[in-house]
């Protein structure tokens, strides 16, 4: 049975420059990843109904740390450093990418990935790399096409269908939905997916503990 979590009770735990500074690697985490201007922080704030839980910046690329938020005991959301922003100094970009890659490859509690991309400019190279990596390690993915309010209904549906078809060859557990923090489009779909991931995995872990 799917448990419904109260995301409005989510609270900030810690910011860390890399995996070594994070909390103990247990429980369940779902990470939010995306280009630096994809609206990641806005999506987290909308999900949790908290205006400043995740810091939003007028300058994309300011989220340089891995940020952890607790939904419930052992259940966490993770805001990963934004990727692909051209105006960030190269040395800093490499540092972020290293921290991002290390988290994705070594964090055992990571059980789901939300990839956010602007609905008007979806599936850039780095977005596809992120999805392919998740598929390779059998991690389920929810793609959120953000800023959906910027398009009329017909154009929005066309983009949604285009991306859904484009990810089919990836052969993974990938769901694609339109999303808008401003108009609250797709927030229910995001909540349902997170509830499903967290509930399924908690049930499996409880069974393993009982053995």
Swiss-Prot record:
Keywords (A to Z) from UniProt: Cell cycle, Cell division, GTP-binding, Magnesium, Metal-binding, Nucleotide-binding, Septation
Stretches assigned to the EngB-type G domain: 26-200
GO cellular component: cytosol
UniProt-annotated binding residues for GTP: 34-41, 61-65, 79-82, 146-149, 179-181
Binding site for Mg(2+): 41, 63
Any Gene Ontology biological process: division septum assembly
Cofactor(s) the record lists: Mg(2+)
Annotated InterPro entries: G_ENGB_dom, GTP-bd, GTP-bd_ribosome_bio_YsxC, P-loop_NTPase
Source organism superkingdom: Bacteria
SUPFAM superfamilies (alphabetical): P-loop containing nucleoside triphosphate hydrolases (SSF52540)
MF term (GO), any: GTP binding
Classification via NCBIfam families: GTPase_YsxC
Similarity-based family: Belongs to the TRAFAC class TrmE-Era-EngA-EngB-Septin-like GTPase superfamily. EngB GTPase family.
Physiological role: Necessary for normal cell division and for the maintenance of normal septation.
The protein's name: Probable GTP-binding protein EngB
Organism: Pectobacterium atrosepticum (strain SCRI 1043 / ATCC BAA-672)
Lineage: Bacteria, Pseudomonadati, Pseudomonadota, Gammaproteobacteria, Enterobacterales
């Amino acid at each position: 049975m799917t448990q419904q979590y109260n995301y409005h009770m989510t609270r900030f735990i810690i910011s860390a420059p890399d995996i070594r500074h994070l909390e103990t690697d247990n429980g369940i985490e779902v990470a939010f990843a995306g280009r630096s201007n994809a609206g990641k922080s806005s999506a987290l704030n909308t999900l949790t109904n908290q205006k400043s839980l995740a810091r939003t910046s007028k300058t994309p690329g300011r989220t340089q740390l891995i940020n952890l938020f607790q939904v419930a005991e052992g259940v966490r959301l993770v805001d990963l450093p934004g990727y692909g922003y051209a105006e960030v100094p190269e040395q800093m970009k490499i540092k972020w990418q290293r921290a991002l890659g290390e988290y994705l490859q070594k964090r055992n509690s990571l059980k789901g990935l939300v990839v956010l991309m602007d609905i008007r400019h979806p599936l850039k190279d780095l977005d596809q790399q992120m999805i392919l990596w998740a598929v390779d390690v059998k991690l389920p993915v929810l793609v959120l096409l953000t800023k959906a309010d910027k398009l009329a209904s017909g154009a929005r549906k066309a983009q949604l269908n285009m991306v859904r078809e484009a990810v089919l060859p990836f052969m993974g557990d990938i769901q694609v939905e339109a999303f808008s923090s401003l108009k609250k489009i797709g927030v229910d779909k995001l909540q349902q997916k997170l509830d499903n991931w967290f509930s399924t995995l908690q049930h499996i872990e409880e069974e393993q503990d009982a053995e």
